[in-house]
């Protein structure tokens, strides 16, 4: 019973972490690419 309540929270947290991490990585990638182009 406790596992059923903890599992959805864990998956939502996992999705939130990935949803925030993916744009951050692409944002950093674009910044590094612009730095490369300027040099």
Curated annotation (Swiss-Prot):
Protein name: Cytochrome b559 subunit beta
Binding site for heme: 18
PROSITE patterns: CYTOCHROME_B559
UniProt keyword Flavoprotein present: no
A GO biological-process term: photosynthetic electron transport chain
Localisation: Plastid, Chloroplast thylakoid membrane
Record keywords, A-Z: Chloroplast, Electron transport, Heme, Iron, Membrane, Metal-binding, Photosynthesis, Photosystem II, Plastid, Thylakoid, Transmembrane, Transmembrane helix, Transport
Membrane-related topology note: Single-pass membrane protein
GO molecular function: electron transfer activity; heme binding; iron ion binding
Protein family according to the UniProt entry: Belongs to the PsbE/PsbF family.
Name of the gene this protein is made from: psbF
Transmembrane spans: 14-30
HAMAP family listed in its UniProt record: PSII_PsbF
Subunit and partners: Heterodimer of an alpha subunit and a beta subunit. PSII is composed of 1 copy each of membrane proteins PsbA, PsbB, PsbC, PsbD, PsbE, PsbF, PsbH, PsbI, PsbJ, PsbK, PsbL, PsbM, PsbT, PsbX, PsbY, PsbZ, Psb30/Ycf12, at least 3 peripheral proteins of the oxygen-evolving complex and a large number of cofactors. It forms dimeric complexes.
Role this protein plays: This b-type cytochrome is tightly associated with the reaction center of photosystem II (PSII). PSII is a light-driven water:plastoquinone oxidoreductase that uses light energy to abstract electrons from H(2)O, generating O(2) and a proton gradient subsequently used for ATP formation. It consists of a core antenna complex that captures photons, and an electron transfer chain that converts photonic excitation into a charge separation.
GO cellular component annotations of the record: chloroplast thylakoid membrane; photosystem II reaction center
Cofactor annotation remark: With its partner (PsbE) binds heme. PSII binds additional chlorophylls, carotenoids and specific lipids.
InterPro entries to which the protein is assigned, alphabetical: PSII_cyt_b559_bsu, PSII_cyt_b559_CS, PSII_cyt_b559_N
Cofactor: heme b
Species per Swiss-Prot/TrEMBL record: Cucumis sativus
One of the Pfam families matching this protein, by short name: Cytochrom_B559
